[in-house]
Amino acid sequence: MLIHGSWHNAWNWHKVVPLIEAAGHRVICIDLPGMGRDKTPVKEVTLQKSVAKITEVIDQQPGKLILVGHSKNGIMVSQAAEYRPDKMEALVYLAAYLVPDGKTQREYAVQDTGGVLKPYVIFDESTQSTTLDPVIYKEGLYADCEDDIVEMAKLLLSSEPVNTGTTRLELTDENFGRIPRYYIECLEDRAVTPYKQQKMYMELPCQKVYQLKSSHSPFFSRPEE
């Protein structure tokens, strides 16, 4: 089950899904609340609503899942796993926020002073959401991707709810802590820098860390890997 990152939706995974299916696996991609085709008003989106949508889909599956999260929404992977530990085979964090119990994604994001996105994040107080200035798409998100991905992003990226990143995670060793987790570090990432990625997986150690010589979006630039 593949969980997209900030401002994105299920279209993230359109290059990797056929490859995973060709290897004999079933793949599930969803739009989180307020994103993509999900029509929840972005102002009403909370961490709990987002996690509830994930766990609802998890509950419909007959067996265990590998839950994969990108970027900010590593937090969704962790919180959903806490609520459904018996349904989890493993957790995979792709350049994702791996945040411990009692902390928020925002706390970790503000520490990442080497990233290039912050000056281009536009806050809308009326909807309590942000958008990203398209001028930074290429450099910040898709540096090693084809130009058509940037053009698609201009059409498909949407507002990102702020609330989800400012809500503290509630994780326990008994549930979240017993599920094997793996990290995929993107070595040329300018959105979630390698420094920040390393700091997170050293604080919450993983079974194994894989490294990709890629920017923030390897599902576009290196889908086979």
Task: Show which residues each predicted segment covers.
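Active-site loop/oxyanion-hole signature of alpha/beta-hydrolase fold enzymes
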Residues: 26, 34-68, 82-83, 106-110
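Conserved loop-alpha-helix segment in the C-terminal half of the alpha/beta-hydrolase fold
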Residues: 187-213, 220
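Flexible "cap/lid" loop of the alpha/beta hydrolase fold
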Residues: 82, 86-88, 92-130, 134, ...
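Conserved alpha/beta-hydrolase fold motif
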Residues: 67-68, 91, 183
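Short beta-strand/loop motif that positions the catalytic acidic residue
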Residues: 177, 183-185
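Active-site nucleophile elbow and catalytic-triad environment of alpha/beta-hydrolase enzymes
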Residues: 152-175
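Conserved HGGG/HGGXW glycine-rich cap/lid loop of the alpha/beta-hydrolase fold
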Residues: 1-37, 65
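Gly/Ala-rich beta-loop-alpha elbow adjacent to hydrolase catalytic centers
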Residues: 68-73, 77
